[in-house]
Design a protein with these regions (language model features):
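Short, small/polar-rich loop/turn modules that mediate ligand/substrate recognition or access, typified
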Residues: 178, 183, 239-241
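Active-site helix of classical SDR
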Residues: 121, 162, 170
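Residue(s) in the substrate-gating loop at a strand-loop-helix junction
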Residues: 146
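Short C-terminal tail/terminal secondary-structure segment
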Residues: 4, 151, 229, 240-253
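Conserved glycine-rich cofactor-binding loop
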Residues: 16-17
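Alpha-helical segment proximal to the catalytic Tyr-Lys
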Residues: 126, 175-176, 237
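Substrate-binding pocket helix/loop in short-chain dehydrogenase/reductase
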Residues: 97-98, 102-108, 197, 209
Length: 253
């Protein structure tokens, strides 16, 4: 059986853990060659061994550094050819009341959650366009936004603002690059149980927040598999500028 993203060259940022790791596993299982990028190289190397060295490449990269982003794409192209599928997953949160959060902390959240998304997407689009229309029409860029970009969550103003910006940036880039055939969409998860969120979800704040949601539960890491595969596949050729919310009704609390 041919995988749903067979023949694609996919780049996943923030792939060393959590959702990024899951996204890489999902794309690889469906036939894509996958470039996994993050700052923690030892974790990436372990993931490459798991997925298979013939079809996976690890690249250590700080996506807030433009030069490192360019080098990441250079390495990907040297190994697999033009990257036609990008999952812009690298991101962070910072739980602190706005009155006590300093400007450096705010900027750090914005730099990783917004600026890096723009930088990676721009580099991908530049190379797709340069490769010609047959390549660019296959372009799929999926920016990982969040339910938090649509609602107010006390104590994470910077994170909420950054994810709202990510979603709007997605629409703007989709409009700019539509004529090249490049599709740009956002995927907005709700509360997902991962290595990074486990402590918070099991703590007092997370338990209280989940208790207010209609179904009073968190989502598993595999909850986003189908939405991700659709947005990265040829089936989504007419879908661009969308923000796909997968949150189990959590934002309706």
């Amino acid at each position: 059986m041919v995988g749903r993203v067979a023949g694609r060259v996919a780049l996943v940022t923030g792939a060393s853990s959590g959702l990024g790791r899951r996204f890489a596993q999902t794309l690889a299982a469906q036939g894509a060659k996958v470039v996994v990028a993050a700052r923690r190289k030892e974790r990436l190397d372990a993931l490459v061994k798991e997925l298979g060295e013939a079809s996976t490449l690890a690249v250590q990269c700080d996506v807030t550094d433009e030069a490192e982003v360019v080098a990441m794409f250079d390495a990907a192209e040297a190994r697999f050819g033009t990257v036609d599928t990008v999952v812009n997953n690298a991101g962070m949160t910072h739980e602190k009341n706005a009155l006590t959060q300093d400007i450096a902390e705010f900027r750090k959240v914005m730099d990783l959650n917004v600026t890096s998304v723009w930088c990676v997407a721009r580099e991908a689009a530049r190379r797709l366009i340069k490769a010609g229309p047959e390549a660019s029409v296959r372009g799929r860029i999926v920016n990982i936004a969040s339910m938090a970009g649509r609602i107010v969550i006390p104590g994470v103003a910077a994170y909420c603002a950054s994810k709202a910006a990510c979603a709007h940036l997605t629409r703007s880039l989709a409009r700019e690059w539509a004529r090249h055939g490049i599709n740009v969409n956002a995927l907005s998860p709700g509360y997902v149980a991962t290595e990074l969120t486990e402590d918070w979800l099991n703590g007092e704040g997370g338990t209280k927040m989940i208790g207010k949601t209609p179904r009073r539960r968190v989502m598993a890491e595999d909850s986003l598999d189908e939405a991700l595969l659709f947005l990265c596949s040829d089936a989504a050729r007419f879908v661009t500028g969308a923000d796909v919310l997968v949150d189990d009704a959590q934002s309706m609390s």
